[in-house]
């Protein structure tokens, strides 16, 4: 609800994009256009996490890995992050939600659309794992992800 009002949901459902490409995705994804290059937006993400004192667990630069394999793909990076004080409560509620933690955000250059932020839809995850949407740790996570995406994408 909170996130839905602030973030655009992508519903590709095999529909052509603006440029006529057919794109596919699954439920549970929230996306948001961001101002700036992948590098600029990525740096804003890392700085935002640091400012909010959220531990960065890992990063993956898929484009760099592709180049190392002699391949090309648009700039695409993933940040894995989270606070155990929040995520642990979710895992105590439903241990299998550990598959979704730590949280992650993808920053990617999408041809024809520009720099995009992709992240899990927290309410969808709650439904998937049968977690009460009113659970305090879930509400904190929902608000946190909206705050981070707003700061990172320049809203």
Roles of regions detected by a PLM:
Residues 43-44, 61, 93, 144:
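Short Gly/charged-rich anion-binding patches and loops
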Residues 128-155:
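Well-ordered alpha/beta subsegment
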Residues 1-2, 8-22:
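Short, Lys/Arg-enriched N-terminal segments with co-localized hydrophobic residues
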Residues 22-53:
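Terminal, regulation- and interaction-focused segments at domain boundaries
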Residues 58-106:
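Compact, glycine-rich, soluble single-domain proteins
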Residues 104-131:
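Beta-strand/loop substructures that line and gate deep hydrophobic ligand-binding cavities in soluble
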